[in-house]
Design a protein with these regions (language model features):
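Glycine-rich phosphate/pyrophosphate-handling loop used in enzymes and phosphotransfer proteins
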Residues: 1-144
Length: 144
């Protein structure tokens, strides 16, 4: 069942009529991206192999129009972008993911931004895959 938050987002920022990357009115794909922007996107390979981490997924490479939108999401209060970015995130089927743990923000940074973009993104990924989110598992101690 669609959450109230998602229904509100659909009313304000409807899927299907405006590209979330270039803001042009155009036919968009299931990720909310027009054909022109789609050709510029580089999806990150999933999963990434990092020796010291059991598993890690990234939706998009931080380049081109995606980099600008990621900055807007993190620093300009454009919370609605979380659902678009979540659409690009894929959890491999062979992973037995029990919980999604967002990276916390230091309280100073949280006060500056007004929200934790990682927690918001994890909410949409949780809805996509039906995996619970635990925002209390990690604590940010040092402001980096």
């Amino acid at each position: 069942m669609k959450s109230f938050f998602n229904a509100l987002l659909d009313a304000v920022y409807p899927f299907g009529c405006v590209c979330f990357l270039c803001d042009s009115e155009a036919l968009v794909d299931e990720w909310g991206v027009c054909l022109k922007c789609r050709s510029t996107l580089n999806q990150s390979p999933s999963p990434l192999n990092i020796d010291s981490i059991d598993g890690f997924c990234s939706g998009l490479s931080y380049e081109g129009p995606a980099a600008q939108k990621i900055r807007e999401f993190k620093y300009s209060g454009k919370r609605f972008l979380a659902r678009y970015f979540a659409g690009f995130m894929n959890i491999p089927g062979h992973w037995n993911v029990e919980v999604i743990i967002p990276v916390p923000l230091h309280r100073k940074r949280l006060k500056e931004r007004g929200y934790n973009q990682s927690a918001l993104l994890s909410k949409f990924v949780s809805e996509k895959y039906g995996i619970p989110v635990d925002t209390g598992m990690l604590q940010k101690v040092v402001n980096t």
